From Swiss-Prot:
<feature type="disulfide bond">
    <location>
        <begin position="49"/>
        <end position="61"/>
    </location>
</feature>
<keyword id="KW-0732">Signal</keyword>
<keyword id="KW-0964">Secreted</keyword>
<dbReference type="GO" id="GO:0005576">
    <property type="term" value="C:extracellular region"/>
</dbReference>
<keyword id="KW-1015">Disulfide bond</keyword>
<keyword id="KW-0800">Toxin</keyword>
<comment type="similarity">
    <text>Belongs to the conotoxin O3 superfamily.</text>
</comment>
<feature type="disulfide bond">
    <location>
        <begin position="60"/>
        <end position="74"/>
    </location>
</feature>
<feature type="propeptide">
    <location>
        <begin position="21"/>
        <end position="45"/>
    </location>
</feature>
<feature type="signal peptide">
    <location>
        <begin position="1"/>
        <end position="20"/>
    </location>
</feature>
<dbReference type="GO" id="GO:0008200">
    <property type="term" value="F:ion channel inhibitor activity"/>
</dbReference>
<dbReference type="Pfam" id="PF02950">
    <property type="entry name" value="Conotoxin"/>
</dbReference>
<keyword id="KW-0528">Neurotoxin</keyword>
<dbReference type="InterPro" id="IPR004214">
    <property type="entry name" value="Conotoxin"/>
</dbReference>
<keyword id="KW-0960">Knottin</keyword>
<dbReference type="GO" id="GO:0090729">
    <property type="term" value="F:toxin activity"/>
</dbReference>
<feature type="disulfide bond">
    <location>
        <begin position="53"/>
        <end position="70"/>
    </location>
</feature>
Length: 76
């Protein structure tokens, strides 16, 4: 095989490796965004629980079946 053929094959290999590496970054960014959305939702639920229980002069001890658990004091 000529030197030019080897150079072309090497170039194709490098391009395919670079492309697959960039695809991996895109997947990581998508996963990171999904995790951030989940965290924001849980923070919102927790804040809503605290506000709901504060109106009843109780403490929010968590959420069960989508409903806040409000008691005088949490046991952990």
């Amino acid at each position: 095989m000529s030197g030019l053929g080897i150079m072309v094959l090497t170039l194709l290999l490098l391009v395919s490796m670079a492309t697959s590496h960039q695809d991996g970054r895109g997947k990581q960014a998508t996963q990171r965004d999904a995790i951030n959305v989940r965290r924001r939702r849980s923070i919102t639920r927790t804040e809503a629980c605290y506000e709901y229980c504060k109106e009843q002069n109780k403490t929010c001890c968590g959420i069960s079946n989508g409903r806040p658990i409000c008691v005088g004091g949490c046991i952990r």
